[in-house]
From Swiss-Prot:
Location of N6-acetyllysine modifications: 10
Mitochondrial intermembrane side: 38-82
Membrane topology, as annotated: Single-pass membrane protein
Function: Component of the cytochrome c oxidase, the last enzyme in the mitochondrial electron transport chain which drives oxidative phosphorylation. The respiratory chain contains 3 multisubunit complexes succinate dehydrogenase (complex II, CII), ubiquinol-cytochrome c oxidoreductase (cytochrome b-c1 complex, complex III, CIII) and cytochrome c oxidase (complex IV, CIV), that cooperate to transfer electrons derived from NADH and succinate to molecular oxygen, creating an electrochemical gradient over the inner membrane that drives transmembrane transport and the ATP synthase.
Signal peptide bounds: none
UniProt-listed InterPro entries: B12D
Recorded superkingdom: Eukaryota
Protein name as annotated: Cytochrome c oxidase subunit NDUFA4
Subunit architecture: Component of the cytochrome c oxidase (complex IV, CIV), a multisubunit enzyme composed of 14 subunits. The complex is composed of a catalytic core of 3 subunits MT-CO1, MT-CO2 and MT-CO3, encoded in the mitochondrial DNA, and 11 supernumerary subunits COX4I1 (or COX4I2), COX5A, COX5B, COX6A2 (or COX6A1), COX6B1 (or COX6B2), COX6C, COX7A1 (or COX7A2), COX7B, COX7C, COX8B and NDUFA4, which are encoded in the nuclear genome.
Topological domain spans for side Mitochondrial matrix: 1-14
Keyword Phosphoprotein in annotation: yes
Amino acid sequence: MLRQIIGQAKRHPSLIPLFIFIGAGGTGAALYVTRLALFNPDVSWDRKNNPEPWNKLGPNDQYKFYSVNVDYSKLKKEGPDF
């Protein structure tokens, strides 16, 4: 398959940016899904030792990818301990 892509790129050089952007988009999507699977507190890989990982988060833990106007270092805890 890689040989076909290289052959098409040699025959039609205008396809090179298309291949670059499709490759970058696929790589970015794969990295984002990997980040969600490994670092998101909603995902539990070990149900016996840590069945509810979201309960161990403190109020200062930022697990969002990007936060516009919330400063997580200044938040106070509002809920009860579990």
